[in-house]
Amino acid sequence: MTRESLAPIASKANTLSESKVSENLMSINSDSGTSNANTPSSVTSNSKPVASSTAAKKDPNAPPQKVKQYVCETCTRAFARLEHLKRHIRSHTNEKPFTCSEIDGLPTGCGRQFSRRDLLLRHQQKIHRNPQPRRRRRSTTALPNPSLSNVSVSTTNLASKPVISLPQADSIDKFRYPKLHAALQAQLANNSGSFSASWLQAQQQRLVSAGNGRETVNASASGAVNPTSSQWSDQRLGVPYGPDSPLYYRRATIASDLRPSVYQHPQLYDFNRPESLSGQLDDESLARMPYSPNAVSRNYAMNMTLPESIPEGYEIDKLDWMSFSESLNLPTFNQPSGPSDVSASFLNLQAMPSPHASPKDSLINKSNSYFFQNPPKSNSVDYTRLDNLEHMRQSCISPSGTNFSPSCYSPESLMQQPLTLSPSSIPSGLPTYAHVNSPLGTEQYPSEAYPPKGYVDMEGRISEGIKEEGISLSEEITDKDQAFASMGYFDSYNFEGVENSNSLNNEGDQMETNFQSEKLDNSNSIPFFNFNSFNNNGANWSSDFNYPVSETSGLLTDNNRNQPPSF
């Protein structure tokens, strides 16, 4: 046989051999369920038709397969991206960094925590009815505060989505605000207790009129203390901060102070505009409020507003959010030559984080202070409440301990123990003066919600007495039947054997103060006393604190020893 005659036979044999190999490979792949990647290289290299047919089945435009290089050390599961591994690790550690703290840019979240942001968004959309679209964020470690610049709220939207029904006003509210009570009842009857566009428009006109009246009364100090909404704008929102703001009705609802005499625009709290303060301030974070060193007396009002909905999943008592305003009269003394010679105690306002995912305001006494202060990282104070009285130093404690006024609600979890007083810790220097004026009633809740729990109950008994290191405080409402309409008041405390008692008759027009200074061991150390009174209709509670001169603490100087205060 010649080589030419054997060529067809060899070609046929090669074809049969390659066909047999191809069938064997297909059988192996079908039995094992694996791809050619698991086939020995020696076999694939010797089967050219199989390699060409496999290459024909692959999509040349398909992206390359991701390499899963991130492996979980707990369960050895691999991931292609590091953030996927971090998210998976939370299933082992039970870490939940995403908290439902803000809804639509407002601090009304319920506080629930989630391990993934998509679960948080789904929770807010389902539970809180938040229509905010899901947006992918760069960071997956925590949920930052969403920007409010994209929030658009109008009266039409608020009217179409009622979130809370306004409670009925009680008999005390009828007595205190008869015109307001009648107007509210008519609105509640027509709108079933929900917000409506017409009601909001009426409230807008009322608030604007109230603000104009307030600014007219305080025209002499309006430029520094009560700027209008056109003067200031919220830098976070990028819109005017007042009745013209689209978010104004989310901040000033029915729970705002409804009395024009003490109304104040919310833009008073503009922590983005530090003003020039006196030379004694070193921390710029404390320079957050307008201040004039030449001012004699300034009146600041704190508007307490109620969120539109109680956060889901929270057992919040009606006392938890309040509706009232605190007016702080801050007198300024004639300053001596330097800051070290200033010896005066004033009331300051401090915004603190709240355990209910909402800011709070706390009243504090602090020496050598002429400013309002606010932590640099605090939230907005649109929704505020008085949770607790916090004292900066022993020399500035009040006789009432942590309860500064009947309108101050202090939950048990936030209650702080009263500080210990001694003759050397009594405030010294010139006699200082501070005044707090708080309405006892509310337009929002029935009367059984006030006074707040932990102070004086509706039957006139103190709920929790304060006794600490020689200080005993007892308070009693003398006329239980007319608790708010005509309220009597009595308080007494004992300081190092010195008895002091203040009493007020039922009509609110007589005050008796008994002070027994002869029991003092050191005649130069006179304990402070407080003057408590009510107006005739019982709507307001006031307390004047007087801290006399103390020679024992050594804070008096030659420059201010004989200098009288200036109001």
UniProtKB/Swiss-Prot annotation:
GO CC list: chromatin; cytoplasm; cytosol; heterochromatin; nucleus
Keywords linked to the UniProt accession: Activator, DNA-binding, Metal-binding, Nucleus, Repeat, Transcription, Transcription regulation, Zinc, Zinc-finger
Presence of keyword Ribonucleoprotein: no
Highest taxon of source: Eukaryota
Polar residues: bias regions: 12-55, 140-154
Main localization category: nucleus
Compositional bias per record (Basic residues), positions renumbered to this chain: 123-139
Any one biological process term the GO annotation gives: positive regulation of transcription by RNA polymerase II
Subcellular location: Nucleus
Pfam families per UniProt: zf-C2H2
Residue spans, zinc finger C2H2-type: 70-92, 98-128
PROSITE patterns reported in the protein's UniProt record: ZINC_FINGER_C2H2_1 (PS00028), ZINC_FINGER_C2H2_2 (PS50157)
Region: Disordered, residue numbers: 1-67, 123-154
One of the record's GO molecular function terms: RNA polymerase II cis-regulatory region sequence-specific DNA binding
InterPro entries: Znf_C2H2_sf, Znf_C2H2_type
Job of this protein: Key transcription factor for sexual development. Activates the transcription of ste11. Binds to a stress response element-like (SRE) region in the ste11 promoter.
The name this protein goes by in its record: Zinc finger protein rst2
Source organism per UniProt: Schizosaccharomyces pombe (strain 972 / ATCC 24843) (Fission yeast)
